[in-house]
Regions:
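Short, positively charged low-complexity motifs
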Residues: 5-8, 19, 52
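Short, positively charged and aromatic/hydrophobic N-terminal segments
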Residues: 19, 24, 35-37, 41-49
Length: 272
């Protein structure tokens, strides 16, 4: 009887663990069939506790993989340079990629759950525009990722880049519609990387460097509530989180810019 009771308890615990994995990884069934041949890996995922890292732990992994991260960075810079893509007032597009990854460096510990996800997170940041802007296909990105990462890591990294690729559309709204945002919400780390992308764009546009970015600043301001709502899956899984610290950094950029405009007398309420 004792053995039977223990078996029931263990079975119930395993069932609860399986349930937590479905919450942890919404497309777990697809993932299961993709990696069904690697039973040991599946067991490790099921039994692995979901947690985020301390900042020092994340920083130690950044230092450990610094050479690989730099190689990924250089390859992404060269890719966008090869299609003559620039950013803002004729800056190299790598300037933007570095800003996006700075957000990952600053806040990645708030979403990253294991060492094996560190490199895919950085790859996703550096290659997030590779399909949309640099003429790569999904399979092209996967091939590049396999040159730096394991098969499992390459899949995760490529999924992030794919999720952040705009849809076909005539307008900005069509290119970033519900299908696009749903893809972000369903992909591990994609909401966070997209938030870092928006933080980078807003930080630059609020610097007042050129007329186009001044225009985009107003677009980003108007989009902000809708944007945050659309990329937030409201998940308990840390990999899908929008860290409050990152959102606050973004808000600080807009507040600082508003205060600057007020000092310069450029806000609409001056004179009333």
């Amino acid at each position: 009887m004792l053995f039977s009771l223990m078996s029931n308890v263990i079975s119930m615990a395993f069932i609860l663990q399986i349930y937590s994995v479905f919450c942890y990884f919404p497309n777990f069934l697809e993932f299961f069939f993709c990696y069904a041949h690697d039973f040991s890996y599946l067991c490790r995922i099921i039994c692995e506790a979901v947690r985020t890292m301390e900042r020092k732990e994340f920083e130690s992994y950044m230092q450990k993989y610094a050479d690989q991260i730099e190689e990924i960075r250089q390859s992404a810079h060269k890719l966008h340079q090869s299609v003559n893509q620039t950013y803002g007032d004729q800056l190299p597009y790598g300037f933007h990629l570095d800003m996006v990854v700075q957000g990952i460096r600053d806040f990645g510990h708030l979403v990253c759950v294991r060492e094996a996800d560190v490199l895919p997170l950085f790859f996703g940041g550096y290659y997030h525009d590779s399909i949309e802007d640099a003429r790569l296909t999904y399979n092209d990105v996967m091939k590049v990722a396999r040159g730096y990462l394991t098969e499992e890591q390459a899949f995760l990294a490529t999924e992030i880049a794919y999720a952040l690729t705009n849809d076909k559309g005539r307008t900005r709204a069509e290119r970033a519609g519900e299908k696009y945002y749903k893809g972000i919400r369903l992909t591990p780390y994609a909401p966070f990387v997209k938030l870092c992308d928006r933080l980078a764009n807003i930080s630059y546009s609020c610097s007042g460097v050129d007329s186009n970015n001044l225009r985009m600043k107003e677009v980003y301001k108007a989009e902000m509530p809708h944007f945050l709502q659309c990329i937030n899956p409201h998940s308990e899984d840390p990999r899908f989180l929008l860290p409050q610290e990152t959102v606050l950094r973004l808000a600080e950029c807009l507040i600082d810019d508003l205060e600057r405009e007020e000092r310069e007398g450029k806000v609409w309420w001056v004179g009333y």
